[in-house]
Amino acid sequence: MWNRRRNQALDGLDDEIRDHIERETEINIARGMSPDEARRQARIAFGSVALVHEDARAAWSWSWVEQAGQDLRFGARILKNSPGLSVTAAVLIALVVGINTTIFSMVNALVTQPAPGVKPEGLVRIAIPERPGAPLVNYSDYLDYREQTTALQSLTAFTNSRVTVASDSGSYAMWTAPVDANFFDTVGVRPVRGRAFTAAEGRSTDTAGLVAVVSYRAWQDVFGGDEDVVGRSIAINSRPATVIGVAPPSFSGTMLNERTDVWLPLLMYLGTLSRETSQRSMTDRNDTPVDVIGRLAPGKSIAAAQADFATMQARLDRSYPTADRPRVAVVQYAATAGGLIPSGAPTLLAIFSVITLMTVVIVSANVANLMLSRAVARQRETAVRQSLGASRIRIVRLLLAEGLSISVVAWLAACLLTIWAARAIPRLLPDSPFGQAGIDFGPDWKVVVYAMVLAAIGTIAFSLAPALRVWRQDALPWLKAGEHSVAPGRSRLSNGLVVLQLAFSVVLLTLAGLATRSVSLMTVDLGFDSQNLLLLTARITGSVTTRESSLALIDRIQERLQVIPGVHRVSYVRSFFPTTQMVRTAGAAEALRATMHVVGPGYFPTMGLSPVAGRPLTIADRERAGAVAMINQNLANALWPGQNPLGKTMSLRMLTFRGESDEQVERVEVVGVTPNAFVGGFNPERPDPRPNLIFISEQRAFGGPGRDPAAPGEITFYLRHGDSDLESVASALGPVLREVDPRVAIVSTQTMDTRLDNVTFSARVIARLLLIFSLISLLIAAIGQYAVIAFNMRRRVREFGVRIALGASARQVLSTVLREAFGLTAVGLLVGLLLSVGVAFAIRGALFGVTPTDGPTYAGVFALLGCVALMACCVPALAATRVNPVQALRQE
């Protein structure tokens, strides 16, 4: 409607202009002028009709909108008229934006994505900054926070544990989340069948009324999707329980890397533990840390909640001054996949930020060269536009419109590439932590905006070079110049862009080389044969009520596994995750940290380890009056340097995240020394990756809270098998365990090699991504170098023709072109070397076994870049030697 009114007004303006000119013409005729002269003088007196139209249009409409539309239509026509260059530029931009957006999408999913099914608005988490990754507050403090808070409308606690769930279909090892009764209301989840926990169930410690909410996946897999699942009886760690609800299919817990299958009331779960553990958990303010999340009250902010918790903490500090109570922080809830993000996440994010910046700069520089070439080809057209009155700003806007048109196409293609990659990553890495966590890497609004920002940066970057050239351009010389005239400034700018691409390619190649070298050096000698070693982790419950029945069950399982065809040796480790002990000797000033493994009979032969001193642990050690252990050479040398450790005694005390535990000190005699071996896997993030190790067996003399062999727990059996027996052995494990005791549940089966590979998974992924980025960047830089050399060669056709006509040989012409090309390469290498050293020193904390100035890495980078530069220069250099002097001299 606005356009129609404006057009009507402009039509009325035309009528008024004609009427004004007609009246002025009549006046001039009355003065004695001829009709033609009278009309001419009237038009002269009125002025430019077109200018009046433009002024009126500017006053009556949004002229900048119309001009922007004209610029965009012009840019679209340019795309259509030169599809080759436009498609090339769009593909390059789409590739770099798509890859970088995919990485950002992964980081976004891992760091900021809420767990599926959770209502994230107003949800906060209570965190402890100085203890990242550790459980948060003790249960007693949580109860006080829940009752006293004024900034949160609800506060709930949860933890996690693995349990054995037995139903009519069998026994299953599942992750359970013991939660407070208001957990589901706080996170905004409603069961699709049945109900959640009541307040009475949340307060009860009576395990006779144990109830459970199961996940949708467990409902389908364990109960076969039974419509009458609510009310069914199951057994959780051999205790009867009743299913009261089924969670929605989208909800499997509050953390991305934790797939919870069973939720239990927290106090009821504590009641299933020993009386001592249960009592300590509910009253000791230095025990039982739990995770705490809450929902802000209406009108309250995170800052208000932080102030509220500071007040409550000060009150608790006065009431319970001896409690270990770290400062807490109220932060926005995010289902961070803690197990998937390495401890050096800030360094890794910084590395990826550098990668993103460099790839965008490399591609933008390459596309800028393409756009600059097109601008040079249209230099006379631009000069004509300037001579006809077009301002420099208007011409620069046209160039920006061309770049924007390319970027819009590239942005759409990049979004499609990101969507495809987000769906492909879990399928391409099904056995990786990323694939197993079930994380949705699909783009959200933040990813889309990120892609738009990258595309906008690229638009400005690659449009800037031709725009600067136009801004400095004088129209008159170009109107007089010939078709092949090119100002020296163009060559300098193009050469500078090539140097920039080469320098950043050197940086990326160096990072990739250092990362690859780090990963290769992580493949150290483990000290034992990891091949043909199958790990079976199982939960033992049911008849495990006494120490004797526990050991009898383990022995029966070991005996049955031993007779599986293809199995050569079998042993076990009591816990898949070993404990950390503080070790002291008589007269020692400081304690040493060591990792302790509780192992079964035959462990060392199964692992292929022989004692270097003393004897191995045997089944007879179970009933000894005093505890005995084997230690590795590393710990023996640290405790008793230059002495014989056999027969000596050491004191052990367990180390927790709060420090040394208050448990009794265990005194253990050393009966053997083992070779140094990474039996728990190689950890490259450990400052001293070669650990101190202690091995003990199932011994009555080694007691203490939490070490009761009768307690339900997990056992990892180590099966040494033949070269071709893996599949047959793995398929026999389930039937064997069911035969021994149907209540024994399999937690996992994996080869030792797979377990070891998972340790370096993040490092290998980073190295591969860096390698891919660097090779793509090098290819783009080589294309850019080829384009510049080829352009310069075409510009100097007359020069080469004159040289050949005057007797220059093909070798001399070839050396001239190659000298120019390798001059660019040398400058790019020098600049890249300086940048690489600086970046390498900045990330040296993420490197393993290599220095930031690693010689083989830099030598390989220089050799690779030199070969690529040579290939990029050969075609235009050889073309220069085949110039026909006669044809070259006839050109304008």
Give, region by region, the residue ranges found by the protein language model.
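Alpha-helical transmembrane segments
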Residues: 95-122, 421-430, 504-532, 790, ...
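Short, strongly hydrophobic transmembrane alpha-helices
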Residues: 83-110, 362-365, 407-411, 494-518, ...
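Interfacial "coupling" helices/loops that link adjacent transmembrane helices in transporter permeases
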Residues: 363-407, 483, 783-825, 829, ...
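Membrane-helix entry/capping segments
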Residues: 42-85, 116-117, 129, 170-171, ...
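Mid-to-C-terminal secondary-structure elements
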Residues: 162, 175-200, 209-350, 423-427, ...
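Negatively charged linear elements and acidic catalytic determinants
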Residues: 1-91, 295-297, 318, 476-489, ...
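Small-residue-rich transmembrane alpha-helices
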Residues: 106, 368, 403-475, 514-517, ...
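Alpha-helical transmembrane segments of integral membrane proteins
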Residues: 56-87, 334-341, 371-397, 401, ...
